[in-house]
Amino acid sequence: LYARLALALHETMHRHPSPEVGLWLRLCILLESPLVLGYREHRALHLRHHRFNGGPGDPDRPLIATAPPRALLCALLVPERAFFEWVRDRGLDARLALGCAVRAVLFLAVVAIDPAVFLAYWLSLRLSIGLSGFVFHHVLHAREGRVGSFALPGGPRVLRLGRWLFG
C-alpha cells in the first residue's frame, strides 16, 4: 500500500502544485519520520532533483554521487536530511512550522497506540524505503564516478530470474 501511495504522490508532484492535492496523498509521507516536510517542500525538492539531475544543485546528489556506504546512509536518512537541509537553507516559516508540528503530533499519536508494533512497522518501512532509494539513486544512477542511467548489474541470468519471479 505504501509503495502505491508513494508512486501516486510522485506522479502528482509532477502535475499539481500544493493547493490541488488532497489530504490522503499529503498524509502518505506522514509515518516516515516525526521530522518530515510537507507536500509543498517535497515537491520543490523533487522538481529540483529533476532540474539538476545528479549535479551540484540536486538535493539527491548525496544519494547518487558519493561512495556507496555514504549513499546508503543518506538513503536511510532521507526525511531527516531533507528536513534539516530545508530549514538550514530556507528557514522555518509559520506554515511549515505548523505543518511539521501537526505531522509530528500525528506521528507520535500513532506510536502511542502500540509502540512495539509501530517500531516493527517503522523499522521495516524505513529499511525498505532506504534500500530501495539506495538502489534507485545510487545503483541505477552512479557508475564509476559518472552520473547517468545505467542497467542493474547482474547480467542475463539475474534478468531471467527477475522475469520468472515477477513476470
Language model regions located:
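Non-catalytic, topology-defining segments of multipass membrane proteins
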Residues: 1-4, 25, 29-124, 130
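Acidic (Asp/Glu-rich) catalytic motifs at the cytosolic membrane interface
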Residues: 2-22, 41-54, 140-144, 166-167
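Alpha-helical membrane-inserting segments
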Residues: 5, 9, 110, 131, ...
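Select transmembrane alpha-helical segments in multipass membrane proteins
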Residues: 23-30, 161-165
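Alpha-helical transmembrane anchor segments
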Residues: 124-167
